[in-house]
A protein has these predicted regions:
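Long, compositionally biased low-complexity segments
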Residues: 65-480
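Alpha-helical assembly-interface signal, strongest on the long, hydrophobic N-terminal helix that forms
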Residues: 1-78
Length: 480
């Protein structure tokens, strides 16, 4: 009995030792697996850094936008797998990994998600560059424009009131003792019909390169010259202007407009550039030729200035009196109060529009103009309206051509278009260096998966827990 008890005790201790050994082996196996996974992840992350470094160089150098080079996309899976093997060999792999398949998926290119991918990168880049003083300065300028735009309805009400008062005395024909004068609006209208580019640039050379529109939407609208001989036509133009987009959301659009002025060329930019010259003008106008884009931007700048100048001219009693006398003189013996009132207001509006043309000429020459004018800042007289000849009065402190480009960019109705048009410009400019470059092949975000096999730890020739290899699958989302 004693021997049996001793044998049972020995067997029990042996089993206890075996259980203890198994527990130790499981713990060691767990530590081994944990360490191996950490090692594999470190090598995997090193491979990710390598792949992320294969970005499109020209895109990064010219625009500070990062995306995978399309040429690398074709070989990324093989390259990543080879990189993993190389790193394992160089680091003296004690875990005896076996590399499996590499797969890239969930790809987003720079043109994806309706421009949101490009927008995200621009915002990330510009978030520290929208300094407080820039924001404050722009806010002040935009507010001045918005305040005067709001006064446009007041001008329309004043015109209507004057004409109604004149109609009450329409039977009292008023003859003028002065000789009949030539209507300056006729000469002015002739100049307007020539188009905004010759009106502003004169004989200066203007680029007319074509723009290849791939991502953006071509703007097919046309700008016609205002007819200051017809009241209804002018009223229609005033109504259309009131419908233009507001700049209420300018804070949210500020990063992209600052990015645009930093990385894209425009008329008064003094830096030399090959290829497209009026890039920001294209972002605004969306035409397929440089000259058309410049012309459309000129018309829109004239319209912006017109509102401010109209407010100024209607606040000047001397100009109102001069316009009334000129209207009566133009109409001569056929003049009567309603017609004189209409002609007077059309003359005042024509003068404000002519002054706006002079303003844009100053802007196109790289000079500044006052945001809000007074009578002392005024340049054009009724005598010079037909030929637009006057002494210009640019200022040192005021708004520049670039400032008005910012206003036009911010006030775009379809705010996504500026991103698509940026894509067009980026692609066309980079193609001067890389002929087959396509922006929609540049990958901004992707998922990369890697399969590995890990040889399990063995004890005395026995593999625990009874399988030679275990599968490891690693993946990460990569975003530039």
């Amino acid at each position: 009995m004693i021997r049996d008890e001793q044998g049972s005790m020995s067997a029990f201790l042996a089993m206890l030792f075996l259980v203890f050994l198994l527990l130790i082996s499981v713990c060691v196996e767990g530590i081994y697996m944990y360490t191996a996974r950490g090692k594999a992840m470190g090598i995997y992350m090193s491979g990710l850094s390598h792949t992320k470094g294969n970005y499109q160089k020209e895109l990064a150098d010219m625009y500070h936008i990062y995306a995978m080079d399309p040429r690398y996309h074709k070989k990324i899976e093989i390259d990543f797998s080879d990189r993993m093997k190389e790193s394992l060999d160089q680091n003296g792999d004690p875990f005896r990994f076996q590399t499996g398949s590499t797969k890239i998926s969930d790809i987003l290119d720079l043109s994806a998600q309706k421009g949101e991918v490009l927008k995200y990168q621009i915002r990330q880049q510009m978030q520290y560059e929208a300094a407080g003083d820039i924001l404050k300065n722009l806010t002040k300028k935009i507010k001045a424009g918005e305040d005067q735009k709001n006064e446009l309805s007041g001008i329309k009400d004043q015109i209507q009131k004057e004409e109604e008062e004149a109609e009450e005395t329409e039977n009292e024909k008023t003859l003028t003792s002065e000789p009949v004068k030539k209507d300056p609006r006729k000469g002015f209208m002739k100049l307007l019909k020539e188009g905004s580019v010759p009106l502003i640039m004169g004989e200066k050379k203007v680029s007319d390169l074509p723009i290849n529109i791939v991502y953006g939407k071509k703007d097919t609208t046309k700008q016609s010259a205002w007819n200051f001989m017809n009241r209804k036509d002018v009223e229609k133009e005033l109504d259309e202007f009131e419908k233009t987009a507001s700049t209420d959301s300018f804070a949210s659009e500020l990063p992209v407009v600052l990015y645009a002025t930093k990385y894209f060329h425009f008329l008064t930019d003094t830096t030399k550039k090959d290829g497209i010259k009026y890039e920001i003008e294209y972002l605004i106008a969306g035409k397929d030729s440089e000259k058309e884009n410049l012309g459309m931007v000129f018309w829109r700048m004239i319209a912006l200035r017109f509102v401010m100048n109209a407010v100024c001219v209607y606040q000047d009693p001397a100009k109102e009196k001069e316009a009334a006398l000129l209207a009566a003189s133009i109409l001569g013996v056929t003049g009567f109060p309603p017609a004189v009132a209409v002609a007077k207001n059309l003359l005042l509006l024509a003068l404000a529009y002519g002054e706006s043309v002079i303003d844009v000429r100053n802007l196109a020459d790289g000079k500044k103009i006052p945001a809000v004018k007074t009578s002392s800042d005024w340049q054009l007289s009724f005598a010079g309206l037909a030929t637009l000849n006057c002494k210009r009065k640019p200022v040192n402190q005021g708004m520049s051509y670039e400032d008005y480009l910012l206003l036009l960019l911010i006030s775009q109705k379809d705010k996504r278009q500026k991103y698509f048009r940026m894509m067009d410009l980026m692609e066309q400019n980079i193609r001067r260096k890389v002929s087959d470059f396509k922006l929609d092949q540049c990958i901004s975000s992707y998922k990369i998966s890697q399969n590995l096999k890990l040889k399990k730890l063995g004890f005395g020739g026995m593999i625990l827990p009874f399988a030679t290899y275990t599968d490891l699958k690693m993946y990460r989302y990569v975003t530039y």
